[in-house]
Curated annotation (Swiss-Prot):
GO MF annotations in UniProt: ATP binding; glutamate-cysteine ligase activity; metal ion binding
Entries under SUPFAM superfamilies matching the protein: Glutamine synthetase/guanido kinase
EC number in record: 6.3.2.2
Catalytic activity entry: L-cysteine + L-glutamate + ATP = gamma-L-glutamyl-L-cysteine + ADP + phosphate + H(+)
One GO term of the biological process aspect: glutathione biosynthetic process
Protein name: Glutamate--cysteine ligase
């Protein structure tokens, strides 16, 4: 079944205050669109500041793919308000454009219409754009325009002091890192519950399949919407951002050093497939290098151990320096029923589940078990709502009904919820009551609700209706925690920071590239 966490929960019930101070941050991606739903081909609006250096508003793969970032904080309502204010501000300054409310893009006629994110003339800015050029040439631009929500989560030092006996984060970085890797292993084993509950991409526009081979047996509506009747998150399927060449990297999550060792090997491992592309076409650079990963961020993962980097530090060097500081959950689709793409219920569930993941026993995991876990995830991603769906337990032949495993998990989460609610309110317990019902009635899941709308309206109609509704809602709402003046200050500061980077460059881009890549 699932690990017995009763002793750990009893221990936590005796120490309820050690969970005070959980820190969270949210990152939300969204495409800028025109009034008819087409991808905006305009530059990143100058009224939003410089995407390279803005603290809260940047771009991801494409110039039209906005990314909103909240600072880390310990107040859920403040984080939601902060993210809402970023959306309100953006809606106010977009000129006749709106934000696409779904994970999967729709009205993109051709990949040539997708402009890579531009970050100015500095070497670091050009490097970021070249990395995206490499992604386009390796995997195609369309799949890089898929949007998601990332959730950053860290437990307070008081928890680690009580749980593993550390004195502080610096001296206890190895034990804390081991705790987060324990969380990650349990996430791989049981995190399929996230797409089951919150997957919101059960369908795609037929244009997304143009020129792409797929073994999926899609059903189609008259307007060209393609769907799988029991799917939860096609964003997380191999139609989305996956990398077949990464499947044999054997990166494991048993401890910090083996993880980093695997990651560093991957960024230096040559790829025959990508070598055929070369690094230049004439005088134009087309990728950073020909290795399996151009940089560490190219590694596809539903969860990542993270530490804030300093200067030009790589993510793995930051982890080596200070250990794991927080984890980044990358399995959330955009929630179409929330103007900001995510809601408080989802955040509170993730708190509960991630705490459970760190409490539950987590034996070391080899690459074979990791493959078994991925098959479980895939089963839920493609057929999670199928009546009687089974879920594998470990790598043997043992299977249990998904609903049974889900309910058992929630019996533990209810105890975690009571602990978190012990200081005030019943919000976490209400989340449990709401979500456990989905295991008896899958029509209550996000994917089922979304699919019903998409089948009746088409993806385009559904997305456009919501984009219009949310635009009007956002521009009519008042700011809650950030003022117009603060947005203006950060906009000017971001431009000044980018200008400074461009002035301070002392070497040519080719020299910079050689320094960064070693080749």
């Amino acid at each position: 079944m699932i690990p017995d966490v009763s002793r750990a929960l009893s221990w936590l019930e005796a120490h309820p205050t050690i969970l005070k101070g959980i820190r969270r941050g949210v990152e939300r991606e969204t495409l800028r669109i025109t009034s008819d739903g087409s991808l905006a081909i305009t530059e990143h609006p100058k009224t939003l500041g410089a995407a390279l250096t803005h603290k809260w508003i940047t771009t991801d793969f494409a110039e039209s793919l906005l990314e909103f970032i909240t600072p880390a904080g310990d107040d859920i309502k403040y984080t939601i308000s902060f993210l809402s204010d970023i959306h309100r501000h953006t809606a106010r300054v977009l000129d006749k454009e709106k934000m696409w409310p779904l994970s999967m893009p729709c009205f993109i006629d051709a990949e040539e219409n997708i402009t890579l994110a531009q970050y100015g003339a500095s070497n670091v800015g050009r490097y970021k754009t070249l990395y995206r050029e490499g992604l386009k040439n390796r995997y195609g631009a369309l799949m890089q325009t898929i949007s998601g929500v990332h959730y950053n989560f860290s437990l307070p030092i008081e928890f680690w002091r009580a749980w593993v006996g550390v004195e502080d984060a610096e001296s206890g970085k190895e034990q804390i890192s081991n705790g987060y890797f324990r969380l990650i292993r349990n996430y791989y084993r049981f995190g399929w519950v996230i797409p089951y509950l919150f997957g919101a991409s059960p369908a795609i526009c037929s244009s997304f399949l143009r020129g792409r081979e797929t073994s999926f047996l899609f059903e189609r509506t008259e307007d060209g919407t393609c769907y799988l009747p029991y799917a939860t998150s096609l964003r997380m399927s191999n139609l989305g951002y996956t990398n077949k060449s990464q499947s044999d990297l054997n990166i494991t999550f048993n401890n910090l050093h083996t993880y980093i060792d695997g990651l560093k090997k991957a960024i230096h491992k040559p790829s025959d497939e990508f070598a055929k592309l070369g690094t230049k076409q004439g005088d134009k650079h087309i990728q950073l290098n020909t290795n399996v990963l151009q940089i560490e961020n190219e590694l596809y993962a539903p969860i990542r151990p993270k530490r804030v980097t300093r200067g030009n530090e790589s993510p793995s060097d930051a982890l080596l320096r200070g250990g794991v500081e927080y984890i980044e959950v990358r399995s959330l689709d955009i929630n179409p029923f929330a103007a900001i793409g995510v809601n408080e219920t989802q955040i509170r569930f993730l708190d509960l589940f991630l705490i459970w993941c760190v409490l539950a026993e987590a034996p070391e995991m080899g690459s074979d078990e990791l493959d078994c876990c991925r098959k479980n995830w895939n089963r839920v991603i493609l057929e999670g709502r199928k009546p009687g769906q089974m879920i594998g337990l470990g790598c043997g032949s043992v299977e249990e009904p998904l609903a049974k495993v889900g309910k058992k998990l929630f019996s533990d989460l209810k105890r975690v919820a009571a602990i978190l609610d012990s200081c005030s309110g019943t919000q976490y317990q209400k989340v449990c009551e709401e979500l456990i019902a989905t295991f008896d009635d899958s029509s209550l899941t996000l994917s089922a609700r979304v699919l019903e709308k998409m089948k009746s309206q088409g993806i385009g109609g559904f997305g456009l209706e919501l984009a219009d509704e949310y635009h009007q809602q956002l521009i009519s709402e008042k700011y809650e925690v950030i003022s117009d003046e603060q947005f203006a200050i950060e906009r000017r500061a971001s431009v000044e920071r980018q200008d400074a980077l461009e002035r301070e460059d002392t070497m040519s881009f080719d020299e910079y590239l050689k320094q960064q890549t070693g080749c």
